[in-house]
């Protein structure tokens, strides 16, 4: 049986890490696409030359033409400029919006049946623009944010409690930015909710609040440490979890930037919520109950995303007609 084809649009740090992970997991054959000549070809050849050592048979190629996307079952989009120190995700808006228009047109022409995962920041606005530009069904276009933010939250909690990351579950909803909403009441260690762990004396509410703040600033913390770029290992691993759930019909419940059409009281927007990803794409939106401060924080986050989308509409009004 022929292997699935996975197209990586953008061959920077995340793109290269994605290609390597796909090879190691043998999720499919990889085509790396980038407008920079030589970069996708060089990276794919380098990774391919590691295959005899690591023992995988997935094929990797590089290309500078959108035609190379033809037949891809999954497209993962990282194209655009990365965030630099002192730069907010919002600063990236006008530059990366133009990139999403071009990428959307390329996917529409050559891989209209693909499952599309967007990683480009500012995420919630870019995945919205990508769906509009491509005209693809909303259930087949998602943004990678919540899996990454939740993974950071889980890591910090596991470190705090000195337990395995495998026994920590956590949900981070809302926009992928400073207004994201780490949900304490839906986060657990071995099924025990965080509020109960506070009562048990494992930690304090003040310490949980510090971890929530660190999660919100997780991306900026890495940007400030690296000084020349942004995170790429954890974002790539997060996107792979989403792609694998689609390709293997695993139906995992993952927090993703998904298109909402009335769910959570939100319409015509992409916002981070729990979804089931299977062979049909986003098969279900898990509309968990939000109340009190959680609802207030979620609504504030939605407002921040709406501001970005409104800015997109002003910059590229033609997107609304697509």
Swiss-Prot record:
Q: Which GO terms describe its biological process?
A: lactate metabolic process; tricarboxylic acid cycle
Which EC number(s) does the record attach to this protein? 1.1.1.37
Q: Pfam families in the record, alphabetically?
A: Ldh_1_C, Ldh_1_N
- Active site (record annotation): 176 (proton acceptor)
Q: Which residues bind substrate?
A: 83, 89, 121, 152
Leader sequence residues: none
For this UniProt record, give its keywords in alphabetical order, as a comma-separated list: NAD, Oxidoreductase, Tricarboxylic acid cycle
What GO molecular function annotations does the UniProt record carry, in alphabetical order? L-lactate dehydrogenase activity; L-malate dehydrogenase (NAD+) activity
What function is annotated for this protein?
Catalyzes the reversible oxidation of malate to oxaloacetate.
**Stored PANTHER family:** L-2-HYDROXYCARBOXYLATE DEHYDROGENASE (NAD(P)(+)), L-LACTATE DEHYDROGENASE
Q: What is the official name of this protein in its record?
A: Malate dehydrogenase
